[in-house]
Structures are given as C-alpha cells and as structure tokens.
Amino acid sequence: MKARLVPVYFQSGRDDDYNRQLEALRALLADEADIAEPVALGAPLPEADAVVFPQMLGDAFSQLEQIRAIDLPRLVITSEFGTMSMWDWEIRSYLRSEGIATIAPYNLSQTRTIMRALQVRRSLQRAKFVVF
C-alpha cells in the first residue's frame, strides 16, 4: 500500500517548473506514494491521504481560505530533492501565523517517513482493536 497524494496548484496555474517538480516527486517517491493528477486549489479533491504543494507561489497569500479549507494533511515538498525549498519558508511561516498547519520535510528520508506514516494512518482507520 502506498500513500495517496493529490498535488494542488494555485490560480496562476501550472507552469513548466510545476510540471518538472511534479515529475521529480513521482520519481523520488515511486515506491512510497501514488501521486494523482493535479487539482486546482479550491476544486473538489479526490480521495487521498494528503495534498502536496509541489510549488509555492505568492498566490498563497490571496488563496488563504482555499488552503485553510483543505481537510487533509498539507505537504510542502517544493525542491527536486524531496524537501521544502529554502525560499518557501516565508509563505509557510505566514500560513502558520494564520493557523494553517503544513508539513515541510527537510530531507528525503523524512519525506519517505511521512509517506509511510500516511500509509499507516489509513491502515489504522480501518483496523479494529480488541481490548481485554
């Protein structure tokens, strides 16, 4: 079982950088995650374990409510190394100041651990525990 991720993109749309990053994530996380087709931020999301932002843009400031409305873990994985790019800290910091939690791994090992945690989370939602 793999983690199911839905990539989202901002109102300014997808560009070549977004598409390159998405393909890099698919390659890096091929064993850990199934990455769906991208969805515009604010559009209905398919069933998934988390959303992933492969690219952070200034649009985040104007689309704050659409980000807040996401009822799944929000991953910020914006570098080709499977981590958060250093210049995205400002947007992430702003989101945090507005009460919006994000997960931004700082190395590929941590990213892969997050994928496994998402897999376990889904498994446990369907599990039944017997308590004596």
Language model regions located:
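An N-terminal assembly and electron-transfer interface module characteristic of large anaerobic redox
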Residues: 1-132
